[in-house]
Amino acid sequence: MNGDETKKVESEYIKKHHRHELVESQCSSTLVKHIKAPLHLVWSIVRRFDEPQKYKPFISRCVVQGKKLEVGSVREVDLKSGLPATKSTEVLEILDDNEHILGIRIVGGDHRLKNYSSTISLHSETIDGKTGTLAIESFVVDVPEGNTKEETCFFVEALIQCNLNSLADVTERLQAESMEKKI
């Protein structure tokens, strides 16, 4: 696919899976990452609502309430030092193993991300002739008092971009290790 075709495919997935209803005091954005690892491998990491620290570098610990991972599950996340927060309480809103979509909503914590929700969807694609994954993550959040929409979006986009880059690093490394074992 050329650049225009890729943008068209991305746009279709965004329209289908990443629509957020915004009010005036909120901001929203969508980020895209092309990952050189197959969809099943990337999804096996992303779908683990109970282990986000496997690829999210700012999370040090996660405890899920209850034993079953399902829509409505709640997790308590401890954040690494250096961030303007130490903990977050999050609810699993979407877990679709067929469409490869995970959605969360933040319901508590000592941070300023009020009414935050995000959706990540994964889609199979071909990268350099090999099976890869298109990861799309979108969010909506209230703009905290004293901040602008631009500042808020910039901050959240930076966090998500770090998470997506880490997801690519982790899954591409796992894919390379898997290929080495086959040789």
From Swiss-Prot:
A GO cellular-component term linked to this record: nucleus
CDD domains referenced in this protein's UniProt entry, alphabetically: PYR_PYL_RCAR_like
Primary location class: cytoplasm
BP-aspect Gene Ontology terms: abscisic acid-activated signaling pathway
SUPFAM superfamilies according to UniProt: Bet v1-like
Site entry (Involved in interactions with PP2Cs), positions: 84, 148
TM segment ranges: none
Positions that bind abscisate: 56, 85-90, 112-118, 137
Site (Involved in ABA binding): residue numbering on this chain: 57, 104, 156, 159
Recorded GO MF terms: abscisic acid binding; protein homodimerization activity; protein phosphatase inhibitor activity; signaling receptor activity
Residue segments, region START-like: 20-172
Domain of life: Eukaryota
Disulfide bonds: 27-153
Motif range (Gate loop): 81-85
Sequence motif Latch loop, residues: 111-113
Record's subunit section: Monomer. Forms heterodimer with PYL13, thus antagonizing PP2Cs-binding and ABA-independent inhibition of PP2Cs. Homodimer. Binds ABA on one subunit only. Binds to CARs protein in an ABA-independent manner, both at the plasma membrane and in the nucleus. Interacts with ABI1 and HAB1, and possibly with other PP2Cs, in an ABA-independent manner.
Family designation: Belongs to the PYR/PYL/RCAR abscisic acid intracellular receptor family.
PANTHER family, alphabetized: ABSCISIC ACID RECEPTOR PYL10, OS08G0374000 PROTEIN-RELATED
Protein name: Abscisic acid receptor PYL10
Natural source organism: Arabidopsis thaliana (Mouse-ear cress)
